[in-house]
Amino acid sequence: MPARPVIVLVDGNAVVHRAYHAIPPLTSPTGEPTNATFGFVSTLLKVLEDHHPAYAAVAFDIGRTFRHDLYADYKGTRPPLPDDLRVQLERVREVVARLGLPVVSVQNYEADDVLATLARQSVARGLDVIIVTGDTDTLQLLSLIHISEPTRPY
């Protein structure tokens, strides 16, 4: 029986954040911060090389979610996003688009919510799913869906 096609779903925010904190500050010749961008792109390319997916997509958060409306202090203890990380999140979105991968964001939902929906739909369509994230919230999806933590060596 032939292997089922694979879809790789990447939690863009989680992987960028992990790279930002794991890799020492790097800058381009023009002074643009690049450590998170470098880490994200390295992880993405390695995952694509290792798994040869038939499909792939990257999800990003785009602001407040329905959870903020339900609970005013949702993520209230988190510090504001550093400017050098904000710049790199935008750069990563550009890189993903240039690589020809779909960027998926849904107003009022976090990236991991979007990935969970895409994962369940993909399984229902007969695909094997690999979610690339450092967010342990996705562990509740484990079944035929595989979770790939980018800090593990590839």
What is the meaning of each model-derived region?
Residues 2-132, 136-144:
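Noncatalytic, basic helical substrate-engagement surface that gates or grips nucleic-acid strands
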Residues 145-154:
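Single conserved hydrophobic/aromatic residue that forms the stacking wall/gate
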